[in-house]
Amino acid sequence: MSATTADCAAGHVTINMLPDDILLLIFHFDRMTHVDKLAVVNSARLRWRWHRLIHVCQRWRSIVFRSPKFLDLALICDPSTPVELIDIWPPLPIIIRDRINRHMPKDYAFQVAIAHLNRVRQIDLCFKSRSQLQRLASAMQKEFPALIHLSFDSDKFVDEFDDDSALAIPDGFLGESASCLQSLNLDFIAFPVLPKFLLSATALVRLTLQNIPDYGYFPPEAILTGLAVLVNLKYLTIGFGRPRSFPDQESCHPPPPTCAVLPALTFFKFQGASKYLDELMAGIDTPLLDSLYITFFNHFIFDISQLAQFMRRTTRIQTPNEAHVDFNYRIVKVESLSPTWTLSKKSGLSITCVAFNWELSNLVQVLMSLFPSIYIVEHLYVYGPRSFPLPWQDPMQWLEVFHPFTAVKKLYVIKEFAQHIAPALQELVGERVKDVLPTMESLFLEGLLPSGPVQEAIGQFVAARQLIGHPVAISRWKNYQVATSFDEQYCGVI
């Protein structure tokens, strides 16, 4: 199809009049628009369908295939795709992606992975049995030089239905070499020789190990050896799957004598025993770390001396301006946010304690030990369950929670806790009124009524503060789920 001079004079312009480089930019813009949409829905399993363009005409097909890198072209297939179907295409990068069927045929030989190992760029699979993982692992005993992303996970319920459920990556995987690998994600998958494997994966940017099974446990000093060479690592997650996955405290090894410096690390997430993390932190230095998320299980005495020292030398998360304390069923979560946090980049420190019968004193211990800058927090938010009762009923124990927050100016409390906190504050009379929250200027209570026992108790606290020259304004907190320290449009003064 072509446009005539008369068409141009009349303003009839077709897309075929555009030069190749302009068409290429249009294709690229279409791809980037698709990528932006995927970022919104957070789906890595969808990709730009470039093959639709090549079926429009021969010219478009030629333009697309001349710029595979610019358009980020790749062939997406599942592990059982016949090699013949791949060979009819140009030699583009290959992405192997599939949720493997439970009843995999015996000839499910992953032919693509074997025949085109030099082109496989990404593998993203979910396994439902050990035989499936073994089948793929046996096909991947050689190095995959183009592989940059590897993600293995298993059906989390596989151990309930399959006696043969020990999903583990065997020795010799990828020829024990992954020099180009940038992202490794394992979920419910054991990799016993991971520390040794990491020694060759020096290009890693993201390492995510979630729900590590018992048989995938590795001691802190072993993983430190592997981490020491990952100078490009920015995101690190180490999570043990269940409380029974954690080793006995007495069996843990002494802190490592050397330190692994991770110069690029900005995000670290851990789930496991406090002793394990304490030993790990004793051997790590992270000068750029600004986001730390920690979850402890079933420990009433936290062994965190090394972790506390680590926190003191991690200066990028030592300047929070607000803290969030969330009491939920069997969970206590304490989170501090830096003044520069955004909805897309929440930087700061988060500590979650999961236990069946945790003590309030443990929370105070964690606060004092891990939040050396808790004394400068100016905005404190207290959340909790709407239906489950708290493990303690003594209102006075709330004073223990508030005691470390000596710089708080604004306190936000949900309705369910107001009836417990108000009587505690009411007991602060005379000189004691300065012992807890001495700098508080505003108290926001969700669902506060003009009159009632809560209002009466708070009124006595306000009067006591007024007598010592430190008045407190009482306001109603309308919506605790969306209110923030920089946006108080949801708070209304009674």
Predicted segment positions?
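Leucine-rich repeat
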Residues: 1-494
